[in-house]
């Protein structure tokens, strides 16, 4: 655990700027085995306005606060002091925020230590086999659930608020379009037809970290509901049969530096739209909304 990194890049898997992740590597006999990570929503990240979600005037990603692309905050077991100076000098209520960040690192370190002890106890071979088995198990469950649906294409559209005072109706109501293609034990969720990105409002949804999560969550909740199927491990294996595509530059796959801090608002509507599409083929399994 010689280094620890910080990451909040919305265009590289993080959800949005205030959700900061701290990553601690897990080594076994000098080989990198895994990462232990904590993520927390922080009170401030040095954005245009105070707070963490009310940045409605953000016209680009730079106005949404400091951006960290997996930068090291510890190196060789020691703090990278300039990074911590940068945090304290550019974040409001920095004592509180930086203290929370230190707590995150401590939690991630604890997780890394516990995982290391687990590997030492059972051995790397057994650990790797168990990881593969649990991922394959979840994949089988999802494939079985998808295969139980009739092959076909199922679509739905939802409109979200855009520029409400604009004379052009196409800019007042922005479509989110979902087409689900079921073929055998695999599913493709296509977002073609979704409105283009909004370059000066923070409602864009990065494909990785927002759109994919909204889709995976909804499909899992419909096809493998916990009340019906019991506990199902949630990880990469579960979503292997689900493929997602979206036109580059649309609201669901924006191009940097389009602002994204309010991505959860259209993200919830996207999840509802996936639910509506699945209602065509699994009406008894959907809810009234997310």
Predicted regions and their residues:
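Short, small-residue-biased leader/transition segments that mark boundaries at the very start
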Residues: 1-2
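Structured core elements
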Residues: 5-6, 23-25, 34-37, 67, ...
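Flexible loop/turn segments at secondary-structure boundaries
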Residues: 12-16, 32-34, 42-47, 75, ...
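Mobile "lid/hinge" segments at catalytic clefts and subdomain interfaces of large enzymes
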Residues: 27-116, 274, 278-282, 286
């Amino acid at each position: 655990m010689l280094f620890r990194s910080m990451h909040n890049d919305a265009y590289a898997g993080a959800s949005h700027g205030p959700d900061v992740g701290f990553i601690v590597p897990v080594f076994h006999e000098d080989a990198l085995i895994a990462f232990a990570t904590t993520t927390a929503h922080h009170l401030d990240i040095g954005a245009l306005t105070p707070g963490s979600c009310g940045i409605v005037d953000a016209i680009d990603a730079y106005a949404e606060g400091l951006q960290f692309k997996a930068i090291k905050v510890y190196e060789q077991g020691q703090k990278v002091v300039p990074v911590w100076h940068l945090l304290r000098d550019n974040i409001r209520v920095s004592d509180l925020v930086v203290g929370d960040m230190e707590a995150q690192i401590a939690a991630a370190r604890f997780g890394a230590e516990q995982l290391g002890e687990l590997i030492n106890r059972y051995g790397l071979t057994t650990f790797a086999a168990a990881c593969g088995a649990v991922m394959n198990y979840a994949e089988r469950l999802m494939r079985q659930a998808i295969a139980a649906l009739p092959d076909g294409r199922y679509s739905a559209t939802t409109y979200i608020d855009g520029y409400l005072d604009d004379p052009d109706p196409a800019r007042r109501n922005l479509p989110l379009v979902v087409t689900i293609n079921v073929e055998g034990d695999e599913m493709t969720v296509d977002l073609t037809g979704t409105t283009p990105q909004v370059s000066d409002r923070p409602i864009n949804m990065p494909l990785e970290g927002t759109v994919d999560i909204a889709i995976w969550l909804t499909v899992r909740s419909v096809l493998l509901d916990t009340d019906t199927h019991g506990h199902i491990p949630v990880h990469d294996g579960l979503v292997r049969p689900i493929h997602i595509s979206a036109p580059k530059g649309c609201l669901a796959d924006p191009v940097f530096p389009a602002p994204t801090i309010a991505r959860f608002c259209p993200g919830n509507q996207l999840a509802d739209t996936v639910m509506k599409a699945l209602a065509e083929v699994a009406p008894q399994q959907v809810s009234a909304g997310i």
